[in-house]
Design a protein with these regions (language model features):
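N-terminal Sec-pathway targeting helices
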Residues: 1-17
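Mixed-charge, polar/low-complexity N-terminal
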Residues: 4, 79-81, 86-87, 140-141, ...
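Hydrophobic alpha-helical segments and their boundary regions
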Residues: 5-6, 93, 152
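Surface-exposed, glycine-biased beta-strand/turn segments
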Residues: 21-115, 121-123, 161-162, 171
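Zn2+-dependent peptidoglycan hydrolase active-site motif and core
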Residues: 100-153
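Beta-rich strand-turn-strand
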Residues: 145-173
Length: 173
């Protein structure tokens, strides 16, 4: 009877471990490729997306140059899903441009050091919906902002065109 209980426990542990592995696997694979890219961006330059261009006929511009490291829904720990798309420039913080992906109304709350949002009243893919594009990590580790002076803290509902320079990639979270 003890042997059956131990085998059952091992089976439960194996299945649980396999479930955790499957949950994290896509993120782990992306993390591995991201580390390769960050160690030597020039060696993987063909992995970079170009700022200001579109993917096929998509209405949105690529907001910055770099490697798309993490996607919406990636998991880094159980019960948590990433809520964004992280693009890594592979250069020194403050050097890689960040531009508006689509025209809309920009807001930067008074206490935001590294982030802004752009409200798009009519999603080009679903015109009956309003969406927001969110731009973040635009400051150094000490919180010194890389957002351009045109958008100081407290900016609210300022219209910007697609391609407008918003700031530069940083490494502040």
């Amino acid at each position: 009877m003890l042997i059956i209980a131990v085998l059952f426990l091992l089976l439960v542990c194996f299945l649980g471990g396999y479930g955790v592995y499957r949950w994290l696997s896509p993120s782990l694979q992306r993390s591995h490729k991201l580390l390769l890219y960050l160690r030597d961006p020039q060696a993987y330059a063909d992995w970079r997306i170009p700022v200001g261009q579109r993917c096929g006929t998509a209405p949105f511009l690529f907001p910055t140059s770099g490697y798309i490291g993490y996607l919406w829904g990636d998991s880094f720990r159980l019960g948590h899903r990433h809520q964004g798309i992280d693009i890594f420039g592979g250069e020194t913080a403050g050097k890689v441009e960040v531009r508006a992906a689509y025209a809309g109304y920009l807001t930067r709350l008074p206490d935001w050091k590294s982030s802004l949002i752009i409200r798009v009243p009519h999603d080009p893919l679903h015109p009956d919906r309003q969406i927001w594009t969110y731009y973040t990590h635009m400051a150094d580790p000490d919180g010194n902002s890389y957002i351009v002076a045109d958008f100081p803290p407290g900016t609210s509902e300022v219209y910007v065109e697609a391609g407008t320079l918003l700031g530069y990639q940083g490494n502040y979270s």
